[in-house]
Amino acid sequence: MVWQTHKVAAFSSNAFDLAEWVSLHPTVRAESPALFTPMLLRLPLILLAGIMALGSSVLQTEKAKWIWRGVALLVVLRLNAPTDFYPWGGGSPNDQQLGRLTAFGLAAVFVIILGGRWLRFFWKPATLILLLASLITALEGYHRAQKVLHSIQIETKLGGGLVLYVGFLIIPMLFILLMSGLMKQKERASFPDALS
């Protein structure tokens, strides 16, 4: 779904396309670190894959765990750089960023998969941190991209994709916080003397 809309269809784009568009602008290429705005727009995919891999650690059946882990890996591979990038180091700075993010995402998902048994004990706070990081990077990336587009007089409007993405992140955050609060209330009700 589109994160921004414009009367010209070429300027209506999702986060991935928006990252590609703004990466062409000289001020974005000169950012420190390089291509920071496109990275902020691409990083939510990596964080989403991390959330999925982390969520797989609390699933009951092995089949469900491996399905979620596989989907997490596919989400990361969505960022894969063009074949011109390989072997490592070739291509444009944009392709280099895609390659690095893909490598980082794959490494992160594999670490989460390997640490699955231990991660299930603190998956709620870890998931909240990843959800919040994804929300912040998506909104900051969108804001910075809009500033770039406005500087070259391309006026765009907020698209439904960004609204849905933000809602997609906020709902599980609220659910985890609500469930944690209910569990604490249940503990207090079960052991009222032990907690005072």
Label for each model-derived stretch:
Residues 1-196:
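Compact integral membrane and secretory-pathway proteins
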